[in-house]
Amino acid sequence: MTDTQEDSLRRGLNNRRRVLGNEWVEQSIARANALNVQFQRMITSYAWDGIWSRPGLDRRTRRIMVLAITAAMGRWEEFELHIRTGLLADPDDPEAAPLDVETIEEVLLQTAVYAGVPAGNTGMAIALKVLKELGRTPPPAAFGEQAKP
């Protein structure tokens, strides 16, 4: 059987839905117009099928990479999208690429070292904003000797 562009689009849409959630994908599709429909099809096929379907990395690792890269590049809208959808992802579904607060913290600490403290700082602020919006505000933590390294 020949793999068609439509097959790739179906797989890409499935990956997008697993990682970003049905609601976000439906909103994105609803915004398609004569200017951007080919772009939408291209990213769905190339990025969401061609890249996100590759066997070399699991989806959680890919999402972590997206967070680090988007923070390093200052692509805060995409960063926030992956923070939010990662926190909302089903923790029992590894294909949904769920994230926890500790992982987000580690990504941003690493990003601050390699991409600069301002990127880490902005990423922390956005992550905290999303956590608060989701009702998952982190508890206060000690800043002194009891703070973890």
Predicted regions and their residues:
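Acidic, glycine/proline-rich low-complexity segments that act as flexible tails and inter-domain linkers
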Residues: 1-60, 83, 88, 95, ...
